[in-house]
């Protein structure tokens, strides 16, 4: 992967000294500024690992499709990574998610499948729906 690609920046986030926590504990406490990832979340790391691992194990190849049930930042991370690797992404998402999140996912190339927001115990829950779609 090109060192100037978007995904080459995943994980290259700075450590920042947490001043108040350091002073309270008497030792230096640092936090990783994960919001500097391209998708502004630690979930970018998980998405990159999952996709790279699936490609390495030949569970998917270029042009293939990943199906994910997500209402959060994992979807944005996956959309960024899938776009870089030439993979298609279908995201099953509750229809209660913000318009901004849905538009971001679409602009990153994800196909959205919106479903009613129901409890996990319901067979129509977005996570269970994504499993059904992936199995077909």
Regions found by a protein language model. Name each.
Residues 1-136:
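PLP-dependent amino-acid enzyme catalytic core
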